[in-house]
Amino acid sequence: MRINLNPANAGLDLDVSIGENKNLGRIAQIIGPVLDVAFPPGKMPNIYNALVVKGRDTLGQEINVTCEVQQLLGNNRVRAVAMSATEGLKRGMDVVDMGNPLSVPVGGATLGRIFNVLGEPVDNLGPVDNRTKAPIHKSAPAFIQLDTKLSIFETGIKVVDLLAPYRRGGKIGLFGGAGVGKTVLIMELINNIAKAHGGVSVFGGVGERTREGNDLYMEMKESGVINEQNLAESKVALVYGQMNEPPGARMRVGLTALTMAEYFRDVNEQDVLLFIDNIFRFVQAGSEVSALLGRMPSAVGYQPTLSTEMGTLQERITSTKKGSITSIQAVYVPADDLTDPAPATTFAHLDATTVLSRGLAAKGIYPAVDPLDSTSTMLQPRIVGEEHYETAQQVKQTLQRYKELQDIIAILGLDELSEEDRLTVARARKIERFLSQPFFVAEVFTGSPGKYVGLAETIRGFKLILSGEFDSLPEQAFYLVGNIDEATAKATNLEMESKLKK
């Protein structure tokens, strides 16, 4: 059966096919991004069903608004949250119950493309092959499907792998302000997982600035993470729900990105990186929706369902026996208050934290990961082994001692330190520089070829520095190199250059 959704404009080609399972309702009330829709008795949609409003507004512009059912109010009414702006809607408009939750395209067709919350491409590169679709709402994997083996997710980035290793299928919080290299670190991780693990990445921009989303897309094209000539060779799919969009879109865009990632894990059996920037905006959007739905606010004005909403999202991000989703989530901390319910609820789910330091970025040490503030639950001898654990602890102790001595050095100078402390400072400065490394995605800016450093090579390099074997080498030799052999080769080159100058 085909019906015209706007009898007042009978000549318009806005027909929607309605099968046996699709019911028709009418808008009864509009409160901003929230709609109340009346349905015939016995024809009520289920919670989370998608509703579609089609028609023309008073100016004759075409309207196509998708909503999601949130509450069944009684009296044959449902309350739904719109995924796009509700301007132009009016009471009495026809609404179609699609009979299922929102479904989005998944699989290889999503690579190199930008989508909105509904899975519609927004990059002007034409339609997407959407023969393979998946609903955004689903249960977390059952216990029996989970892979409980603790294993390190090697990133090829020295500072991360040594001091705050990521767990395969774990969740990592990425803390960093503007301009400290968060985007470059994200792009390098996307590049490395594709090369070393044969994996792909999904980036979910949740409530971020449109400008930042555009900049990220442009930088990904420039660095080769997105291949414009052959989109199938791209390593990432992007899903954006920007700050200017209604709270419904910002609340669900994380689930859209997660659904795409789950397909790569479960069907393609790949290791997937899922980036969520920013997880706080997901909570913030949920808070707005909760208030619009008339729920009583909880602590600090947040939604009473905060823990449930966060848990529903986070529990789907996990390792199964087929593949893994490793999630890196940027975390905004309101007013730097770590006890705020939003970041506090997020911390309960994190396996590791990567903290970016403005001080290190100012020194030109990239990636600017703070080696003392970054933490990981994986850094235990029974998981990473004694050698890795001992090396990491010695590196941290050396850097901590250097940090303590910096005030004395600033006031009295290096000469006033004991011989032992001077040796510690010299080694700490070498370690600090050896924690930097050239990135593949930054080759176009730096001119230095990127380096992927395996975990065994990383441990060997830091052990040799700590043992004092390279005390005679200049600290500049350790700056922006890959493994320790490159540092010794660079030291030889520096020595030859200085001799030639003389």
Swiss-Prot record:
Catalysed reaction equations from the record: ATP + H2O + 4 H(+)(in) = ADP + phosphate + 5 H(+)(out)
Residues where ATP binds: 176-183
Chief localisation class: plastid
Compartments (UniProt record): Plastid, Chloroplast thylakoid membrane
Modified positions (Phosphoserine) in chain numbering: 17
Family annotation (InterPro entries): AAA+_ATPase, ATP-synt_VA_C, ATP_synth_F1_bsu, ATPase_a/bsu_AS, ATPase_alpha/beta_chains, ATPase_F1/V1/A1_a/bsu_N, ATPase_F1/V1/A1_a/bsu_N_sf, ATPase_F1/V1/A1_a/bsu_nucl-bd
Subunit structure and binding partners: F-type ATPases have 2 components, CF(1) - the catalytic core - and CF(0) - the membrane proton channel. CF(1) has five subunits: alpha(3), beta(3), gamma(1), delta(1), epsilon(1). CF(0) has four main subunits: a(1), b(1), b'(1) and c(9-12).
Record's function text: Produces ATP from ADP in the presence of a proton gradient across the membrane. The catalytic sites are hosted primarily by the beta subunits.
HAMAP family reported in the protein's UniProt record: ATP_synth_beta_bact
Name of the protein described by the UniProt record: ATP synthase subunit beta, chloroplastic
